[in-house]
């Protein structure tokens, strides 16, 4: 009180100053809901005030929450703090004591450690005092008590502290107040919070605490993973039919497209059947061609030849060839096999002499240049034979080897 009197202008020690009523300074039992006031320093030369320490200690014990708490029990006789030293006095920081112990929150056990990954922004209440400017500087009248306005300022997350930097600096999550701007979130962020992830896609503290406490617990949201998986599977499954169907469906319609598809399948089936029949026929012909000549016969171009190892008369040789639907060699046969295979010097051919002269077995006459020699005078020599590649007249009863010739089947 003496210091406040000495600070009055004019240096009058006995002057009486109007003092504020004590009831306005003493916190009553009916005002526990008013947030704590934090006085701003204005002068470095002022001495610390015990009243400011009491107010700061009381403010530190209150939780910055939007919910109202019941008044704390107080003794029967309230303690009257000393009079205020005036506006602009810097309060001294209070000493550590029972009043600075942090009270447990609702639903939290005393002494529980904060959960990991729980650093979240909070709201500060700033005490703004407006001082009128109309008061004279040299007046002895004390300035009126400034009006007080409380503003809620949203404080974002500090960039100096990471969410997972140090568990010692992590705070508990608090529910945002109704008037705060931090509580206004988008529906997407609210959905992520309900599903167990925060706005950045990390796991909530309840889920993250299940992992190792030393490592950062960060996971992808299940909803985001399912959405990405569905987005990857939809084009593969062809569920977006309007984009994946062929252009023919858009132009002709689905019924016509299905009908044309049926016709295409039927045409392909018929084509496969015809191809199979053609392959079977060609294979059968190839097998028959390989067996055109009987066993023991030789294939030469389009004729089959049989070279006998025995000797018989001309008539017996012709009878053997007729049994295999063949004949003794004719002119066309002779020119073919004589050029390819060696023929015995003395083998029968299919030429003989009748009443009309020399002719082949098929009744074709012999050309004049092929007529046998020395056959005109001897009437018993009426059968043709080969000797050294030349057609000669021989006795029909003389045994000779023979050659049978026939066309391919």
Curated annotation (Swiss-Prot):
Keywords tagged on the record: Disulfide bond, Lectin, Membrane, Phosphoprotein, Transmembrane, Transmembrane helix
C-type lectin domain segment(s): 300-405
Residues where Phosphoserine is found: 158
Pro residues: bias regions: 72-81
Disulfide bonds: 321-404, 383-396
Segments for region (Disordered): 1-120, 193-216
Major localization listed first in the record, in broad terms: membrane
Stored InterPro entries: C-type_lectin-like (IPR001304), C-type_lectin-like/link_sf (IPR016186), CTDL_fold (IPR016187), KLRG2 (IPR043318), NKR-like_CTLD (IPR033992)
Pfam families xref list: Lectin_C
Membrane topology classification: Single-pass membrane protein
PANTHER family: KILLER CELL LECTIN-LIKE RECEPTOR SUBFAMILY G MEMBER 2 (PTHR47606:SF1)
Name used for this protein in its record: Killer cell lectin-like receptor subfamily G member 2
Species per Swiss-Prot/TrEMBL record: Homo sapiens (Human)
Phylogenetic placement of the source organism: Eukaryota, Metazoa, Chordata, Craniata, Vertebrata
